[in-house]
Structure formats: C-alpha cells, structure tokens
C-alpha cells in the first residue's frame, strides 16, 4: 500500500490477483465387464485438464487395457481429445483414437485374429446460450475410420485390397440441457451422412456387394437423459436413445448396445446394428452416510434392440439386463461397487459365459483424483 503525500485519504492499494490453476482431474478403475473375446477384466484410465494452453480449453485422454482370466492382454484402446475456444460462442474439438484387439479367449484359428482401428474426428460447436440453468448448442463434425485385420500376422480384408477398410461420415445436430434445482435433463438430436470420398473405388465396389453405398448411407438419431432428486437420499436416473437408418450404413455409423452405452451387466460391446434403441433406469438410495463415507443401493433395469438390412439377409437382436448394486463411496475419491446382475433376452453368451459377469456378479473399483 502506497500513500500520496501525507493525506491518508489519498492512500492507494495495489493488488495483484492471479487465477488459481485448474488441477488435473481423472479416475482409474478396474471392472469385470470387458469385451467378449478380448478379456473379462478391463483397466480404464481417464484424465482431464482445463485451461491447459489457453483459458477455456480442455484436454481429455482415455486409455483402456482388457485381459482374460490368465492375464493375457486382449485389447489396447486409447484416445486423445482437445477442445479449443475459437470465440465466446464457437468451439472446435479434435480427437484421435486407436485400438487393437486380439481374440485371446477364442480357440483354433480365431485365436490368431487381430483387428486394429484408427479413428479421427473434428467438430465445430456453436453455443447459442450458456447459463447456470440451461444450455443450447449446435454441432457439425466429420469422422474418418480405418480398420485393419490380421490373421496369424498377415493382413486380410473382406473389403478392398491391402487388408484395410476405410470409411467416413458427417454428423450434424443440436443439443439442449437444463437444470431446475432437483431436476436436470439434456437432449440431443443428430443426423448422419456417409462420405464415399473416404473409401477407395475398390472398397466401394466391395461394399456395394453387401448392399452398402456410403453416399446413400443416412440416419437420424437422438438421446434423452433425466436426473431427478426425489429427496436428499433418493435419485432417479432415466435414459433413452435411438437411431433410425434410412439405408444400409457402414460399420462406424452403427448403433451399439453394451455396458459402454449404459446397459450394465453386459460386456462393453455386445451387439450393434444400423438402427436401434436403448433405455435404462436406475434408482439410487443413499441409506447410510457420514462426513467421509456413504453407502448406496442402486437397482437398475435396461434393454435395447438393433436391426440391419443387407443383401445377404436381415439381422435383428434384442437384449436387456437388470440387477442390484451395492456402492461404497469414501472421501470423494473411492468408489467400490459389487452387484448382482441378470441379463435377459440373451440366447448365447459367446466367450463370456464363464466370466463372473456370466455368473451374475458385477464388480468395480474406482479411484478419482
């Protein structure tokens, strides 16, 4: 504090204020709902950093390892995403993902099958309104996908030469979210359009034999999520999503069912198709708590279905799962879940009938930082 002359009323106070840096955030978890064929156990890590290079930007990194009961590595999955603000209303997100899967749970020649995938995505988001109570936005993006297949280390492919398939599509839509005290919800709608320019002429010819013409591949979809705090100890969560394909779609445009899309009690990816629907509901009851820990019971139920049409024939399938979870939360860092689950409309359980999950037991250990 400095003083002008001898008059204390003319004193000047100079303050230097620096914004507190945003810490790294994330979580590490171990679960038993891996991917059928690649292993029951999955280790998942997520880390996020806001204001990394500029105010308002976000870096997100995700990594996953899947292994079978003999600790043989079956899948490696990773992705990185960066969101940069271009203006107060416009944001750009670029992401890149990589995965490699081995069928370590298979027998015979299938055990030597390996698939590798690269995926890139770029999206512009225009935020119309963003307040403490609601958020409106529109988005448009382009996705490119490449799949490589290997059998005993040698490339092969059912579409195109060289052992690789490449496809892409455009995605455009809008989203809305609102927070009304104890009640919050968000919804989104989107449209998909295949882009044949991502595929070679030979690949387009091979896809056409399956009835797939990327230039004609189109779909509409949407999702709705609701969260309602019925009381200080009861929370109801509802979710629904769906997609309708107007023509045959490439695999990267499909609709997927599994625990990765909210159906607890199933492998990460169970089944996919061009069109599909999904609904889930969960009621969380916090029946005991103190200043550092809490215990919760969470009954859940969900189901979905997919369908596809091909020149070789039509395909459709439905699946569901219900159960009860016991959840222990400690110090805002630890989350331990143990549950009984019961899948239904499951005619076969290839590779996962011998899992703990196949016996009706679900487990999860998570640490947040």
Enumerate the language-model features and the residues they cover:
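Repeated loop/turn-to-beta-strand initiation elements of outer-membrane beta-barrel proteins
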Residues: 23-26, 52-59, 88-94, 131-136, ...
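Outer-membrane beta-barrel initiation region
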Residues: 1-93, 130
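Outer-membrane beta-barrel "beta-signal"
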Residues: 47, 328, 333, 340, ...
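Residues that define the transmembrane beta-barrel architecture of outer-membrane proteins
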Residues: 9-11, 39-43, 74-78, 116-120, ...
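Transmembrane beta-barrel wall of Gram-negative outer-membrane proteins
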Residues: 57, 70-176
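Transmembrane beta-barrel domains of outer membrane proteins
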Residues: 18, 48-50, 81-85, 123-129, ...
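C-terminal outer-membrane beta-barrel translocator/porin domains of Gram-negative envelope proteins
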Residues: 148-295, 299-303, 307-309, 346-356, ...
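Transmembrane beta-barrel strands of outer-membrane/channel proteins
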Residues: 3, 28-32, 45, 59-65, ...
